[in-house]
Amino acid sequence: MKRAIILVLDSFGIGAAGDADKFGDVGSDTMGHIAEQCDKGLADNGNRKGPLTLPNLSKLGLAMAGKESTGKFSAGLDANAEIIGAYGHAAELSSGKDTPSGHWEIAGVPVLFDWGYFTDKENSFPKELTDRILERANLPGYLGNCHASGTQVLDDLGEEHMKTGMPIFYTSADSVFQIACHEETFGLDNLLTLCQIAREELEDYNIGRVIARPFIGPGKGQFERTGNRRDLSVEPPAATILQKLVDEKGGQVHSIGKISDIYAGCGITKKTKATGIPALFDATKEAIEQAIEQAGDNTIVFTNFVDFDSAYGHRRDVAGYAAALEYFDGRLPEIMDMLQEDDILILTADHGCDPTWPGTDHTREHIPVLVYGHKVPAGSLGRRDTFADIGQTLAEYFETSDMEYGKSFL
């Protein structure tokens, strides 16, 4: 019985990539800078204090992978841990440092074209685009039309949105069109319908994602984004390993969290939504249990832990990011202990989002590639030239046809 469990620690980069200069990210290091701040006592809060403590990830080779990426061990991590898994770091071949590019490349399909972007900080969207969206949605107008932090824009425009019923349109350095609306005054269904209209109207702009950003709360300073976020992505430009597993092997791909949205549902046979790292962990364990009970051969359980990125990376919350990593590390053995003889566990990321870096955007970094299983030899996988090595490895593991990109590390 072959099963692969893929856990994406969204934004957990481990050192600047070789082409970071093209993105203004030379010197970025999500893991290293978090560890450094923790070691200096600058990341203490009510949930954690002191050096970054990740014993289970260190046993899988995280500290070693970080050293291979940057040339030095991250402060406080156990450099002498007994390694029980295969570890390495991967560079990104894709042209961007966004979520779809990273995930598609992990699944064997790098994004070699350039996404469309809304580069103007103010008046970001073409008038003909917003006019068509408003006309189709029968709305009187909109707010925003700018680059913005997702939480700041709620404080700035949330109350006006509630009074007027006008949605908040905003974007970022990523290829995204984001729409924020209040779940109660505007309605979640209305927001999702509006996002579908925007997705259709953006077809000619080559924008990667339309993101629904629902929120609740009575007023400024009290608004909170909910777990009902939706990402409306374009479809990958070629068959991913997920699609090949389903089409060629009759396999199962169980998506946890926003994975299904990222792949536009392509190659997904079952999806489970969950909000927050604890709930995502629980849902992942339940999916693994189901696969084992049903003797599910040729199965992938694929989880994205988005909070590392959305709640801590973009918000530049070092202490929150560190606490979340330590929570994740503490629960990791629960999944490791579930693995059967032929199962493999892959832990990785899709890009960086260094919480010590200027601004609020992603950072161009290497990602960790940690692989564990009863039949996986411990040791270094070295530097991988593309995230697609993961997809190619899965193609070899499941005996599908080869992916066009990547080299297997099995």
Swiss-Prot record:
What family is it from? Belongs to the phosphopentomutase family.
Biological process (GO) annotations held by this record are: 2-deoxyribose 1-phosphate catabolic process; 5-phosphoribose 1-diphosphate biosynthetic process; metabolic compound salvage; nucleotide metabolic process
> What Pfam families does UniProt report for this protein, alphabetically?
Metalloenzyme
Q: What is this protein called?
A: Phosphopentomutase
Q: Which CDD domains match?
A: PPM
**Major location, coarse class?**
cytoplasm
Q: What class of enzyme is it?
A: isomerase
Instruction: Provide the reaction this enzyme catalyses.
Output: 2-deoxy-alpha-D-ribose 1-phosphate = 2-deoxy-D-ribose 5-phosphate; alpha-D-ribose 1-phosphate = D-ribose 5-phosphate
What does the entry comment about cofactor binding? Answer: Binds 2 manganese ions.
Give the Enzyme Commission number. 5.4.2.7
What residues bind Mn(2+) 1, as annotated? Answer: 10, 350-351
Q: Which gene encodes it?
A: deoB
Q: Which ranges does the record mark as transmembrane?
A: none
Q: Which SUPFAM superfamilies match?
A: Alkaline phosphatase-like (SSF53649), DeoB insert domain-like (SSF143856)
